[in-house]
Amino acid sequence: MTSPLLRIMIDAALAAGEEIERIYAEGCAAEEKLDGSPVTIADRHAELIILERLARDFTDIPVLAEEEACAGRIPELGARFFCVDPLDGTKGFVARTGEFTVNIALIENEEAIAGVIYAPDPRLLYYGARGEGAFRAEHKVEAEPIRVRPRPATGLIGVGSRNHAAPGTEERNARLGIKDYLPSGSSLKFCRLAEGAADVYPRHGRTMEWDTAAGQAILEAAGGRVMVLDGDAEAGPLRYGKIEDGFANPNFIAWGG
């Protein structure tokens, strides 16, 4: 049974997804933000919808949202806040790959404890929360539970970005024992681990908290974990609310089983 809080997060993601679908069908151009990343009218419209939905039901929980944060509008964050990426994978949206998502997470005491990821094309929903498990629902089909797969002794399946391969990726993959590689865009990489389609997602390169929070919550609810990397060594779970770092993440590795 889905908790009321998670249900509201799901409804907000679906509403934002509907607006993204509408704009996707019409087509739109991307602009460049100060950090060089792309943004479209779909990002902005979707974020407004999510902010309005969450504010209606959770007046006491602040929201860290990507476009607001990039514009310098950062609320005072307490121990509990929402972390939102209204359109993760804007490059995929503009290129019409279908690999873009709406990400909404709830953070509590620096940990991602609940998350929703919605892919408007092909209308695929993932969600999960601590103590509730993780689920996947296709369009108009009842949700089914998902779980990471047991880690194989050899021949790991790795997942990673189509657009952001860091220098040394092939060498690191070899050290991890990755034999097959599943390229994937946006936060869907975490979903591939959570549903047992892949085993490991090493990330060396720029990500922000809103890129990873929902995916981490879903993956951990499915039995996986996300760990900070210090070189090749794991150095504790990935945490949130890193305002002193501009909400940027360090290198990390996400594991399925």
List each model region and its residues:
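Conserved beta-strand termini and adjacent loop/short-helix elements that scaffold enzyme active sites
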Residues: K33, E66, S161, S184, ...
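Glycine-rich active-site/cofactor-binding loop and its immediate structural neighborhood
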Residues: G78-P122
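Residue-level signal for inorganic ion chemistry
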Residues: I20, D43, L54, T90, ...
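N-terminal subdomain of lithium-sensitive/metallo-dependent phosphomonoesterases centered on the IMPase/IPPase/PAP
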Residues: M1-L87, P167, E171-A174, C191, ...
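Residue-level structural signal for beta-strand termini and adjacent loop
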Residues: A69, T97, Y118, G131, ...
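Acidic beta-strand-loop-alpha-helix segment within the catalytic core
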Residues: I104-C191, L238-G257
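Conserved beta-strand segments of alpha/beta enzyme cores
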Residues: A29, P62, I157, G177-D180, ...
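Oxyanion/phosphate-interacting regions
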Residues: M1-D11, G17, E170-R175, C191-G257
